[in-house]
């Protein structure tokens, strides 16, 4: 676990629990998404990592976000500014999204193939993963010719390497040991 994730997780968890309790998960997702974009803005990024006073920085940040943040979202920004943590807002968003996916029983699966997959192949992979993981699966498909043939699937902690490159690497390891 990276240091950024360690710092971001408590803020994301608190925001998520508040959002669930108040049935406002999608609203909070929007607020955090906007705040994370603001935090990534080069000018704001320089101020966040500069020597601006926490209260002044929080007021500036809330001012930039305007009506995109409700009162509770503004409070989160103020707490994060007081603790010098506004720079981790993108990581807070990522953790919040992970908590939401867990609540929705969803998982993002990266499917890397040597060639473009047909819609039928994508549907078959998605159905198989949904059955195996007992979750709704969203596929993120990409191509990598270095795999030679086959697919590499990553879904959470699960990695399925059905590529020729992976098989060759495993054979090479077996021969060397």
UniProtKB/Swiss-Prot annotation:
InterPro entries: ATP_synth_OSCP/delta_N_sf, ATPase_OSCP/d_CS, ATPase_OSCP/dsu. It is a peripheral membrane protein. The keyword Ion transport applies. The keyword Transport applies. Pfam families: OSCP. It comes from the Bacteria. It is found in: Cell inner membrane. GO terms for molecular function: proton-transporting ATP synthase activity, rotational mechanism. One of its GO terms (cellular component) is plasma membrane. PROSITE patterns: ATPASE_DELTA. F(1)F(0) ATP synthase produces ATP from ADP in the presence of a proton or sodium gradient. F-type ATPases consist of two structural domains, F(1) containing the extramembraneous catalytic core and F(0) containing the membrane proton channel, linked together by a central stalk and a peripheral stalk. During catalysis, ATP synthesis in the catalytic domain of F(1) is coupled via a rotary mechanism of the central stalk subunits to proton translocation. This protein is part of the stalk that links CF(0) to CF(1). It either transmits conformational changes from CF(0) to CF(1) or is implicated in proton conduction. This is ATP synthase subunit delta. It comes from Aeromonas salmonicida (strain A449). The gene is atpH.
């Amino acid at each position: 676990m990276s240091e950024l994730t360690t710092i971001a997780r408590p803020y994301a968890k608190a925001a998520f629990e508040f959002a669930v309790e108040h049935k406002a998960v999608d609203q909070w997702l929007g607020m955090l998404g906007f705040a994370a974009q603001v935090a990534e803005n080069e000018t704001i990024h320089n101020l966040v990592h500069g020597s601006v006073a926490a209260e002044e920085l929080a007021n500036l940040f809330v001012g930039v976000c305007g009506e995109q943040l409700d009162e509770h979202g503004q409070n989160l920004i103020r707490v994060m500014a007081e603790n010098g943590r506004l720079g981790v807002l993108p990581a807070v968003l990522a953790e919040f999204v992970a908590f939401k996916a867990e609540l929705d029983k969803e998982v993002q699966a990266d499917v890397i193939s040597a060639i473009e997959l047909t819609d039928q192949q994508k549907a078959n992979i998605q159905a198989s993963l949904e059955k195996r993981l007992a979750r709704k699966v969203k596929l993120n498909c990409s191509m990598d010719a270095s795999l030679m043939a086959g697919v590499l699937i990553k879904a959470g902690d699960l990695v399925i390497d059905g590529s020729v490159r992976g098989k060759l690497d495993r054979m090479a390891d077996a021969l060397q040991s």
